[in-house]
Amino acid sequence: MIIESRIEKGNPVVGMETTVFVHGLPRKEAIELFRRAKEISREKGFQLVVIGILKGKIIVGMSEEELETMMREGADKIGTREIPIAVAKGKNAATTVSATIFLSRRIGIEVVVTGGTGGVHPGRVDVSQDLTEMASSRTILVSSGIKSILDVEATFEMLETLEIPLVGFKTDEFPLFFSRKSGRRVPRVESVEEVLKIYETMREIGFEKTLMVLNPVPEEYEVPHDEIERLLEKIELEAEGKEVTPFLLKKLAEMTNGRTLKANLALLEENVKLAGEIAMKLKR
């Protein structure tokens, strides 16, 4: 079998990408996050499955040991487009949001969690597959908005053009990963029940898009977006393609003395909690 699913029958399930662990965080923090996310899922009563490709096999529910193998041996960062190539060639591959949504939907997972989604990069034609996958797959994605390193205006416009619905969870503003505010308004929801009512409406009318549930970084960990923008102006880009985002995130962590790293870990933990709550109430 190409796909090895370790989903336990009857449990509410949340899917999670592998790129955040393999390419988005230092190894020590990545393993700590994996353990903490698993701990949260056990405490709350849902199953968190980390999805990746190991030696050509798609694994839904990777173990800590398998994740460490990917980190040690290396793994390509892949979107939906690259899945069949990675499998056919027997590669290790870390899934991005797009690949995670695609694979989740194929096995019946309706709730996916991440830190920040991809979008439109500034200054060049570089548009993430995350956007096109969200435009064609009905699921619920919990995130803290788009990554702060992107062209915010262009990405926000692209979300509208692609008809991707988004709601702010207890916020009126579109969050920007490390930052709580962007100056762009979004419809606000106050509860998981409101989220599920919107999602059920999508299902009833055949609206095959991803519902983005935007959960801002905790206030005490926020790094204001104007500070992020000033720092980005100072960075000389030494990467291209899929390596741009990991490169910039690493540079920002260095330049902020780890503040962006702490923000990343904090928002991911909160997003896992919210995604689990949504999955549990969806299951009922």
Curated annotation (Swiss-Prot):
The keyword Nucleotide-binding does not apply. This is Pseudouridine-5'-phosphate glycosidase. Keywords: Glycosidase, Hydrolase, Lyase, Manganese, Metal-binding. One of its GO terms (molecular function) is pseudouridylate synthase activity. Binds 1 Mn(2+) ion per subunit. Pfam families: Indigoidine_A (PF04227). Belongs to the pseudouridine-5'-phosphate glycosidase family. Mn(2+) binds at residue 126.
